[in-house]
Regions:
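Beta->alpha turn/N-cap motifs
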Residues: 1-13, 87-88, 104-112, 129-131, ...
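Short helices/loops that flank or line small-molecule/ion binding pockets
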Residues: 1, 70, 89-103, 116-121
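A bilobed periplasmic-binding-protein/Venus flytrap-type ligand-binding module shared by bacterial periplasmic
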Residues: 33-44, 137-142, 157-181
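Short, glycine-/small- and polar/acidic-enriched structural segments
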Residues: 1-59, 126
Length: 224
C-alpha cells in the first residue's frame, strides 16, 4: 500500500513524476510485517541503540526500502544512523559478516529467507519497538497497523515476540480494464484448485481476500 499511496498522491518515490491515478485495487493478497534484526550477540537492544550504527535499509526504489526509511524517519533516527542500501541476499550476508549492524526488511508475514538462513549459522534477534514507538509510527503512517511478531521457531536466536507493524499488499489493475475482465481474472484465481496451486508456489496466496479498509482514509479506489 505504501507505494500505491505515494503514486496516488505524487509523493515520495513518485514526487518527480506527479500523481498517477490510473490504477485500481482488485484484491488484498497478503499482509506483511516489517522486520528489524541484529546478530544475537550484538549489544543493540533498542532502536535508540542504533545511533551511529550501520543500518541496511535495502535497495533504493524498493517497497521495503520505503518502509525501512519510514521507521527511522518516523522515530527521528534517520540522520543518526549510517544507512546502507543493499538488496535482500546481500544484506543477509553483510549482517553475517558484520559489515552492517542492523538488518531491515519486509516479512512475509514474519520471516525473510535471507535472515532465516543466516540464523542457522549465526543466531539473530528481532528488535522490538517499544509500545510508544509502535504507536508513534502507526499514528504517523495510517496505512500501518500495530502488530506483534510472534517467536518464529525457524529463526534461531529469536526468543521473544517483537512489536512491529503490518500493512497490506494489494493486487492492482489499470482503471481501463472492464469489470467483466476483472471478475473473470479474480474468479479464475480464486477457484479453489487454482488457489491451491498458487499457494503451493507462494504460500501467501492462501490469504487472498477483499479487505480494503486501509484504503478508506486515503480515498484510494477499488475497481471499478
Amino acid at each position: 500500500i505504501v507505494q500505491s499511496y505515494q503514486s496516488w498522491y505524487g509523493v515520495g518515490l513518485f514526487k518527480k513524476d506527479g500523481k498517477n491515478r490510473d490504477f485500481r485495487v482488485v484484491a488484498n493478497v497478503r499482509n506483511q510485517t516489517q522486520i528489524v534484526a541484529v546478530l544475537d550477540r550484538s549489544p543493540i537492544r533498542t532502536f535508540s541503540d542504533m545511533k551511529g550504527k550501520v543500518v541496511n535499509l535495502l535497495s533504493k526504489g524498493s517497497g521495503s526500502n520505503v518502509n525501512c526509511e519510514n521507521i527511522f524517519k518516523g522515530l527521528g533516527l534517520m540522520d543518526k544512523i549510517k544507512p546502507k542500501f543493499l538488496g535482500f541476499a546481500a544484506s543477509g550476508r553483510a549482517l553475517g559478516d558484520r559489515q552492517v549492524d542492523v538488518f531491515c526488511s519486509a516479512g512475509a508475514p514474519f520471516t525473510i529467507p535471507a535472515l532465516t538462513e543466516l540464523s542457522i549459522r549465526k543466531p539473530v534477534r528481532y528488535i522490538s519497538m517499544s509500545p510508544a514507538e509502535q504507536k508513534q509510527l502507526t499514528s504517523k503512517f495510517k496505512f500501518y497497523a500495530p502488530k506483534t511478531i510472534p517467536v518464529q521457531k525457524d529463526v534461531r536466536g529469536m526468543k521473544e515476540p517483537a512489536l512491529s507493524f503490518s500493512y497490506p499488499v494489494f493486487w492492482y489493475a489499470h482503471k481501463s480494464m472492464s469489470g467483466e475482465a476483472i471478475y473473470e481474472m479474480l474468479k479464475i484465481a480464486a477457484e479453489p484448485s487454482n488457489l491451491k496451486k498458487l499457494a503451493n508456489t507462494a504460500g501467501y496466496w492462501k490469504t487472498l481476500n477483499g479487505d480494503f479498509s486501509s484504503l478508506v482514509s486515503y480515498k484510494m479506489l477499488v475497481h471499478p
